Amino acid sequence: MLREMLKSKIHRLTVTDADLHYEGSLSLDEYLMELADLKPFEKIDVYNINNGARFQTYVIPAPRYSGEVKLNGAAARLGHKGDLIIIASYAQYTEEELENYAPKLIFVNEKNQPVEVKESTEVK
């Protein structure tokens, strides 16, 4: 049996822009994508802390170390510049893989720079 579990999470990102007329997706600093083990066009869940909106889209790389977090296309209706969001990705794991399972957790500052990166199943 496969279980779908959190693969990675980037916590409290600040939206830097929103472009309603772009084709779609979420543009994310390439460095943050690497830290969270996200590949271009990978499906992500986005949770808007400011307004409670939750939606799925896919991620595309923005310039490395830019801090860019841009909502594109229809997603631009679900958040605004300055909103705080969480990005989560999920994967399926076998029971054997779960024996050593730990999701990647990335915490950022107000400039979307990573301040803590850990792999943990600890629940606070």
Swiss-Prot record:
One of its GO terms (molecular function) is aspartate 1-decarboxylase activity. Its main location: cytoplasm. Substrate binds at residues 57, 73-75. It catalyses: L-aspartate + H(+) = beta-alanine + CO2. Pfam families: Asp_decarbox. Its cofactor is pyruvate. It is found in: Cytoplasm. It comes from the Bacteria. GO terms for biological process: alanine biosynthetic process; pantothenate biosynthetic process. Pathway: Cofactor biosynthesis; (R)-pantothenate biosynthesis; beta-alanine from L-aspartate: step 1/1. GO terms for cellular component: cytosol. Is synthesized initially as an inactive proenzyme, which is activated by self-cleavage at a specific serine bond to produce a beta-subunit with a hydroxyl group at its C-terminus and an alpha-subunit with a pyruvoyl group at its N-terminus. SUPFAM superfamilies: ADC-like. It is an enzyme of class 4 (lyase). Binds 1 pyruvoyl group covalently per subunit. Keywords: Autocatalytic cleavage, Cytoplasm, Decarboxylase, Lyase, Pantothenate biosynthesis, Pyruvate, Schiff base, Zymogen. The modification Pyruvic acid (Ser) is found at residue 25. The active site is at 25 (schiff-base intermediate with substrate), 58 (proton donor). HAMAP family: PanD. Heterooctamer of four alpha and four beta subunits. Catalyzes the pyruvoyl-dependent decarboxylation of aspartate to produce beta-alanine. This is Aspartate 1-decarboxylase. It comes from Aquifex aeolicus (strain VF5). The gene is panD.
